[in-house]
């Protein structure tokens, strides 16, 4: 969102100098997913908890959400997923990552440069994804190159079968703990073996 505030400010500066502010747009498809703005004031036992919490969220973020609504029509190449639709990494995985892009008769692999620490989740789909800071994201939006270090690829063989009462979450947490102890950071992981086959 901060990047779009900066672009709006750039439009104002260009207009002040007599230029055409409508020419300031991201040159690559840009998606703004509004998440993590919901404060839970009503508990899960209240059947209307979601609606009540969303109403509070809308009231507290009225100016912010108004600006975000404006960006949907003011800028080209901007797609907005409003609040109340889920969290960024879930939306990226389920709705926003086509894996293969197709434009002007050319097909090419999708990439994702995002400011959320969970951006790399889309790597699971074969989308090359990196998390960056806000300024680097703005550079990408304006057509500047982003350096992507190709990470090491590490195979993780899962053996055995999942036992009754053990959830996929239990396995993920145990794997995360193990990989941290082994100092596996910044690598692509490929899971294979009979244990991986039994997960799906």
Question: Could you say what each language-model-derived stretch is?
Answer:
Residues 1-200:
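Fe-S-dependent hydro-lyases/dehydratases of central metabolism
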């Amino acid at each position: 969102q901060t990047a779009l505030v900066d672009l709006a400010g750039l439009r104002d500066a260009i207009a002040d100098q007599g230029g055409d502010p409508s020419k300031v747009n991201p040159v690559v498809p840009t998606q703004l997913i509004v998440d993590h703005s919901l404060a839970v004031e009503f508990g899960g036992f209240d059947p209307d908890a979601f609606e009540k919490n969303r109403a509070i969220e809308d009231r507290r973020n009225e100016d912010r959400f108004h600006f975000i609504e404006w960006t949907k029509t003011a800028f080209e190449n901007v797609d907005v997923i409003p609040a109340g639709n889920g969290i960024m990494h879930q939306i990226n995985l389920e709705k926003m990552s086509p894996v293969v892009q197709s434009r002007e008769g050319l097909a090419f692999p999708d990439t994702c440069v995002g400011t959320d620490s969970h951006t790399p989740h889309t790597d699971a789909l074969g989308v090359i994804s990196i998390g960056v800071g806000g300024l680097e994201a703005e550079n990408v939006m304006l057509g500047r190159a982003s350096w992507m270090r190709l990470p090491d690829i590490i195979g993780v063989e899962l053996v055995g079968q999942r036992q009754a009462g053990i959830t996929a979450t239990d396995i993920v947490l145990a794997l995360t703990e193990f990989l941290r102890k082994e100092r596996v950071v910044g690598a692509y992981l490929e899971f294979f073996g009979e244990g991986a086959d039994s997960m799906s």
